[in-house]
């Protein structure tokens, strides 16, 4: 029962992590306008994401534009896109594999095979969490580096958006769920070596009987 509870908890965390990754990759809130200087009121706020950028006017009107050309995008943005898509597919595959080998399903009857399937699902989810973590940390490092770079104009400086924080949380949920699934795998049973069987052997008396017969001859 404890193993089943850990599996359900791990799969629940993995589902939440997958949904968080999907929302983080879809929202254009990876980079937002940095409020630098004494003036708080600005004419517009810029949001930048993996797939589009949005401009929010001071009146509340928002205009979004999807990136048209893939080749015109920076290489770091292309890599972040690819890693996020691969992470989403891997996490979905890990969830399907976990459902197949879960204790509460009857897709596989063998208990040993179920344990190996759940362990595989946990490893896949751990890998998906790492793939989510790479573009999020990469983008955050680039934003912080440009923010403190005196050569970058203040109008071009950005701050960390909400999608980055959501991406960190989603990666943590995926890795935590994958770790719980790996912990549900039972340890291999080691057979204890059997000791030598103790028995009693009756000594042969043929030699003694032969000597006795020769003595009488």
Swiss-Prot record:
Tissues where the protein occurs: Expressed in the liver, in peripheral blood mononuclear cells and hepatocarcinoma cell lines.
An example molecular function term from Gene Ontology annotations: virus receptor activity
Record-annotated membrane-spanning stretches: 8-28, 82-102, 117-137, 160-180
Pfam families (alphabetical): PMP22_Claudin
Tagged with keyword Nuclease: no
Domain of life from the UniProt record: Eukaryota
Extracellular-side segments: 29-81, 138-159
Region called Disordered, residue ranges: 194-217
The protein's name: Claudin-9
Organism: Homo sapiens (Human)
């Amino acid at each position: 029962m404890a193993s089943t509870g850990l599996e359900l908890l791990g799969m629940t965390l993995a589902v939440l992590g997958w949904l968080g990754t999907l929302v983080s990759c879809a929202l254009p809130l990876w980079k937002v306008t940095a409020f630098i200087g004494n003036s708080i009121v600005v004419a517009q706020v810029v949001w930048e994401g993996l797939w589009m950028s949005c401009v929010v006017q001071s009146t509340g009107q928002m205009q979004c534009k999807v990136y048209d050309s893939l080749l015109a995008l920076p290489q770091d943005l292309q890599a972040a896109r690819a890693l996020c898509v691969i992470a989403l597919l891997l996490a979905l595959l890990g969830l399907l594999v976990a459902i197949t080998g879960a204790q509460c399903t009857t897709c596989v009857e063998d208990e040993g095979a179920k344990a190996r399937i759940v362990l595989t699902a946990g490893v896949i989810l751990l890998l998906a969490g790492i793939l989510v973590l790479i573009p999020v940390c990469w983008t955050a490092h680039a934003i912080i580096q440009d923010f403190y770079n005196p050569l970058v104009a203040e109008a071009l400086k950005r701050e960390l958006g909400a999608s980055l924080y959501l991406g960190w949380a989603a990666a943590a949920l995926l890795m935590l769920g994958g770790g719980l699934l790996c912990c549900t795998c039972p340890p291999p049973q080691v057979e204890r070596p059997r000791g030598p069987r103790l028995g009693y052997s009756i000594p042969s008396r043929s030699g003694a009987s032969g000597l006795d017969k020769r003595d009488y001859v």
